[in-house]
Swiss-Prot record:
Gene3D superfamilies associated with the record: Metal-dependent hydrolases
Listed cofactors: Zn(2+)
Domain of life of the organism encoding this protein: Bacteria
BP-aspect Gene Ontology terms: bacterial-type flagellum-dependent swarming motility
Residue numbers binding Zn(2+) 1: 7, 9, 73, 192
Binding-site residues, Zn(2+) 2: 15, 40, 194
Protein name: Probable phosphatase PC1_1798
Organism expressing this protein natively: Pectobacterium carotovorum subsp. carotovorum (strain PC1)
Name of a matching Pfam family: PHP
HAMAP family xref list: YcdX_phosphat (MF_01561)
Record's keyword terms, sorted: Hydrolase, Metal-binding, Zinc
MF GO annotations: phosphatase activity; zinc ion binding
Amino acid sequence: MYPVDLHMHTVASTHAYSTLHDYIAEAQQKNIRLFAITDHGPDMADAPHYWHFMNMRVWPRLVDGVGILRGIEANIKNIEGDIDCTGPMLDQVDVIIAGFHEPVFPPQDKDTHTAAMIATMARGDAHIISHPGNPKYPVDIRAIAEAAAKYNVALELNNSSFMHSRKGSEPNCRAIAEAVRDAGGLLSLGSDSHIAFSLGDFTHCERILQEVNFPQDQILNVSPRRVLDFLEQRGMPAIAELANL
């Protein structure tokens, strides 16, 4: 069990079913010390309104020993790497995940997907690329792993991709883990939980990590401190309330 989960959704994304309180309670039961709420960016049809992200400043940083990161799963919008987290929103979030979603960026071809993903990393706002192994969006895996290492962006192993969503992801996810390992980059583990019971469930991710002998020192989720150090290295301000997690 890793003590950090960096991808989940609340009822603010209306196809999810749990509240912030639900996730805090689940984190306490599972000894999860830090999680990021990453509801969908506003260009998705059922995503929270822009004001949801602007008002995240009212969230507590720490509740009964559980740290909370203010995040977003932004949408990659085009081949230029634009995402739907811009302007004042950037000042309200701690962590930005970005990925392809069909209502915003319909699947195209491998070269287009690869170019868009690398452009997103190069623009510098995204910290993590979500579910890059989605078979509907084939990419040049070696190229994105090398770009992620170059731009200090983590690629995600998404546990939900092995279960409920994005059927056929496993071979791609295994290849991505191998490519990130060899490029010296970083992996982020995300439950992509849409209900609190699956918070921190990385069962399938851990199997892939073991199969490819992936180094623990290239995994963000090993500790809260590693995540916070990574975000600070990426230019995000230190979060004093989480300093002792």
